[in-house]
Amino acid sequence: MTNMELAAKVIQELVHTGVREFILCAGARNSPMVHILDECKNLKVYSFFEERAAGFFALGRIASTRRPVAVITTSGTAVAELLPAAVEGTYSSLPLIMVTADRPKHYRGSGAPQTIEQVGIFSYYNEVALDLDSENSHLSFKSLSWKKPIHVNVSFEEPLIDGPVPQIHIPSVSERTKLPVQIPLGTLKEMETFVNTHKPLVMVGILPEKAYGTVLDFLKQYKAPVYCEGISSLRGHPDLKDVEIRSGEKMIHRVLEMGVCDSILRIGGIPTARVWRDLEDKYKELPVFSVSFNHFTGLSRPVQHCNSLDLLSQVEFSYPHHENVKVNIEDAARATQIRQLLDKYPDSEQGMIYAISKRMKGSSVYLGNSLPIREWDSSSSHDFPPARVAANRGANGIDGQISTFLGWAHPELENWCLVGDLTALYDLSSLWVTSQLDAKKFRVVVINNGGGQIFHRMFKKEIFINKHQISFESWAKMWNWSYDKWHTIPEDNKELNLADHQIIELSPNWEHTQEFWKEYDLLWKE
């Protein structure tokens, strides 16, 4: 089998299994695949020069399209650059397919140029690793769960281009087969027993878009107090106004301390709220039942768990949860006090998040790392909910965030991304792909507070913060994006006057931010 035939076989099998988009990091060793994809005009091919950004961009495309996406790299350290995306894809259950070109197998262990041990490099972070060459070209993607990345390593001999370019057939129907989700016998009964014998507080984390309706219907029927994180895309939903906690995650502690709720029902991804970590110690005796889209429980202790959100549509209640009146009264009062604080300190980080969130109703919003996520959950307006919200919360890293956002962006919506300054610095090459995208309206908002200020309240030591005085204006100029720096949020939409490709650098008032936190903490001590 020639190199060109082997490359065509791999690409054809990927197409048969449902791949319609390829992220191509062209090099010499993967040139057989480059030639084939360049001739195939019926497939979407994105061109990248940097593999780490390419991997995270692919995760965004997978999250947006709900189809597997393949990244193709050359050999050597280019392969290693995909590891961060493979880690995130594993914990987010996104089927990233990593196709890595390799030098012939007899070079392994030799230390020859651009020769590393590529097979097994992703260790735990792939569902299967296939090692192909002209003598061993069998590959199949059947009987996979499609909930973890997949590694296909392909060795090519020289000369690399050793024949004509084969044609790729694009079938009208893909043949990807998924293992049926196995809900263990008795799990439905276990959950019905849990919700009918406990008084849980419901915490909703990140959800696949197809699950929004199922989860919303369950919450409306069950009527338990519910804390919807922003990344659930259900925060501020009008159908939940009588059950949703709107004063922030500290109210969860109040609900548990008042005895209104005696357990936690987690729905969706692992929550970002601090109270979830407290389930390991402070609330270690509290019963927990998790209903998610993968097998990760998010806790080190044993809990009841189901890895299918479809279970929610099958649950029958003996009676709905009716513990909301007392919670609603206190929650509404505290939410009003918090809004007063936000109005009092409009140029604090929290006040700026509150104000800018009012511009995002019906938009796509991507939250890029820990601090923006927490500030969005504590401070954004419930009255102007976005159409969709997302984040990379599998491994909770700050790398590749803007690349993921660009992959996830919706072609028909205004797309906002909120990131911290260090997160933006991690992904400066991300804007490379902009000219290749169907989506047009991008707003990357960089909260520039001079370093990793999430650590300021945690450790009180400057060494954790990585202080800097960097401006992002040159970054915008480098990629020909428009740039604005805001010390306060414009009050009138007409004043925004945003370009299609817009970087907004927020410069919060440090003193106002600290005063906000002081008064916020005092509010919860009352």
UniProtKB/Swiss-Prot annotation:
Question: Could you tell me the keywords of this UniProt record?
Answer: Magnesium, Manganese, Menaquinone biosynthesis, Metal-binding, Thiamine pyrophosphate, Transferase
- Pathway, per record: Quinol/quinone metabolism; 1,4-dihydroxy-2-naphthoate biosynthesis; 1,4-dihydroxy-2-naphthoate from chorismate: step 2/7; Quinol/quinone metabolism; menaquinone biosynthesis
Known HAMAP family for this protein? MenD
Q: Name one GO biological process term.
A: menaquinone biosynthetic process
Entry's Gene Ontology molecular function annotations: 2-succinyl-5-enolpyruvyl-6-hydroxy-3-cyclohexene-1-carboxylic-acid synthase activity; magnesium ion binding; manganese ion binding; thiamine pyrophosphate binding
| Cited InterPro entries | MenaQ_synth_MenD (IPR004433), THDP-binding (IPR029061), Thiamin_PyroP_enz_TPP-bd_dom (IPR012001)
Annotated protein name in UniProt: 2-succinyl-5-enolpyruvyl-6-hydroxy-3-cyclohexene-1-carboxylate synthase
* Co-factor remark: Binds 1 thiamine pyrophosphate per subunit.
Gene name per UniProt: menD
Organism of provenance: Bdellovibrio bacteriovorus (strain ATCC 15356 / DSM 50701 / NCIMB 9529 / HD100)
Q: What's this chain's function?
A: Catalyzes the thiamine diphosphate-dependent decarboxylation of 2-oxoglutarate and the subsequent addition of the resulting succinic semialdehyde-thiamine pyrophosphate anion to isochorismate to yield 2-succinyl-5-enolpyruvyl-6-hydroxy-3-cyclohexene-1-carboxylate (SEPHCHC).
The UniProt family comment states: Belongs to the TPP enzyme family. MenD subfamily.
EC numbers? 2.2.1.9
